[in-house]
């Protein structure tokens, strides 16, 4: 073990224990201590789910990327494992960036990651150089391959940047070979996804440019994932520098899902459908795994690079992962629902049916809390007179609240946290165009202390946001402009 890795493990062990359990979410992953961003190495190995993550144990700000590590039996209750990787080699001394994990034929676990070094140009300027490296281990301790890096600038197609070449996602193909997709930037400055192949996980060859951005969806495409699901091929990626397109794509760092067919001759993706992945404020760098029971499960960094100043300055940790989601493809669209394991945490059921709200704000007995699972069905009370607006307020007291607001005539759902307690002028609102019948809206709202995730119409769309309101703000209320009828089921999550 290197001195740098040993130092990180000792530091996190001491400092992580200073953070009380009640200061963390109940079932969302947070860093043991310090900073967290992209999920890495999301995998199932030796009877447990493993998640690694971009990690700086020494500060709640980004720097000196390590790989943190947690394991779980149920994807909801996670245990910390010592830091897996530190930037302790010449080829990765400026960071062990994002990557993935897979089990090898001999039973060892392979980690594949982006290794970052720097080079000095003739004019004296210095720039990052990104290559790909691997490490192997037993689920706790990992040793870097002595022939790293395994992919370098010589393995890039013509015109591709060696500065933006990152985030390998590895899987095993039906032909017995290992494959990986990597984000890249071509000569036009936008993004592309490269496909590589290996017989053993250590020696790689370039196969094709799987997909090209061509300056349609942002610029660089980060954190790609590629898999077959329900008879279609799905490419997930997180574009930088997005421009808005209606309510489908938002400014800044976004999410993109491309669904289509794979050409087996050219190894290129034939696009058929494109959509956002999450329509809320905080969701980036998705990664999936194939569970032993065949489910495709996705997790992401529930944060936004554009809202890093929305934070608790006295906290020993920064950022969290999303709730894992089960994926499916229906009618050319990606659907997402909370993992079914969450149902086992449900308790204290409270149910109301056919509650009519008209031009007033309503609270209901026992409908409150910050660790809850709330199911709502909203309909017009009078089919001939559509209500103008419905609001759900949560994390609410006399001073603070966040809201979900639905306007059925526009079919627009908006999440708004500007009254959540933030002292910074950041992104606090996001909207999506809800598909389907405006006469009925189904919502499943998952609250976990510092976040909200909203699943719309059985997972056709999802909105996620960090909510840092003080925990004593537990109120939940409902409002309708006009007359709306509600069915409500609330569970506490324990």
For each feature predicted by the language model, list its residue ranges:
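Beta-rich carbohydrate-recognition and catalytic domains
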Residues: 1-167, 172-217, 230-279, 302-352, ...
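Beta-rich accessory regions
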Residues: 9-15, 253-494
């Amino acid at each position: 073990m290197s001195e740098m890795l040993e130092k990180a493990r000792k530091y996190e062990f001491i400092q992580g224990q200073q953070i009380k359990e009640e200061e963390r979410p109940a079932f969302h992953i947070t860093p043991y201590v310090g900073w967290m961003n992209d999920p890495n190495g999301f995998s199932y190995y030796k009877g447990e789910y493993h998640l690694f993550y971009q990690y700086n144990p020494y500060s709640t700000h980004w720097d000196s990327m390590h790989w943190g590590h947690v394991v779980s039996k149920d994807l909801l209750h996670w245990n910390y494992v010592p830091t897996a990787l530190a930037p302790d080699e010449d080829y990765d001394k400026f960071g062990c960036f994002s990557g993935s994990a897979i089990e090898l034929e001999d039973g060892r676990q392979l980690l594949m990651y982006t290794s970052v070094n720097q080079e000095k140009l003739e004019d004296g300027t210095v720039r990052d150089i990104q290559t790909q490296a691997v490490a192997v281990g037993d689920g706790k301790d990992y040793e870097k391959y002595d022939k790293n890096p395994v992919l370098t600038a010589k393995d890039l197609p013509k015109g591709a940047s060696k500065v933006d070449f990152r985030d390998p996602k590895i899987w095993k193909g039906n032909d017995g070979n290992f494959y990986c997709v990597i984000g890249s930037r071509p000569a036009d400055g936008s993004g592309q996804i490269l496909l590589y192949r290996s017989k053993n996980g250590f020696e790689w060859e370039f196969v094709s440019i799987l997909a090209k951005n061509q300056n349609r969806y942002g610029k660089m495409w980060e954190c790609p994932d590629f898999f077959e699901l329900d008879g279609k091929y799905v490419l997930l990626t997180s574009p930088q520098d997005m421009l808005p397109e209606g309510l489908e794509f938002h400014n800044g760092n976004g999410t993109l899902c491309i669904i289509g067919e794979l050409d087996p001759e050219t190894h290129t993706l034939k696009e058929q459908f494109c959509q956002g992945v999450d329509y809320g404020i905080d969701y980036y760098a998705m990664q999936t795994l194939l569970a032993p029971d065949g489910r495709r499960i996705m997790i992401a960094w529930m944060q936004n690079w554009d809202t890093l100043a929305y934070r608790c300055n006295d906290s020993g940790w920064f950022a969290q992962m999303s709730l894992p989601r089960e994926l499916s493809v229906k009618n050319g669209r990606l659907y997402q629902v909370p993992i079914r394991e969450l149902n086992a945490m449900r308790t204290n059921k409270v149910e109301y049916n056919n509650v009519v709200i008209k031009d007033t704000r309503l609270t209901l007995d026992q409908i409150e809390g910050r660790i809850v699972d709330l199911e709502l069905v909203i309909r017009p009370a009078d089919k001939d007179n559509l209500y103008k607006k419905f609001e759900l307020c949560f994390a609410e007291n006399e001073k603070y609240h966040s809201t979900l607001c639905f306007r059925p005539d526009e079919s627009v759902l908006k999440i708004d946290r500007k009254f959540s307690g933030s002292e910074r002028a950041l992104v606090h609102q996001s909207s999506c165009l809800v598909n389907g019948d405006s006469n009925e809206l189904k919502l499943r709202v998952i609250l976990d202390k510092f976040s909200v995730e909203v699943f719309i119409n059985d997972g056709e769309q999802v909105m996620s946001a960090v909510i840092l309101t003080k925990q004593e703000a537990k109120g939940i209320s409902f409002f309708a402009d006009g007359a709306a009828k509600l069915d409500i089921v609330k569970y506490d999550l324990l």
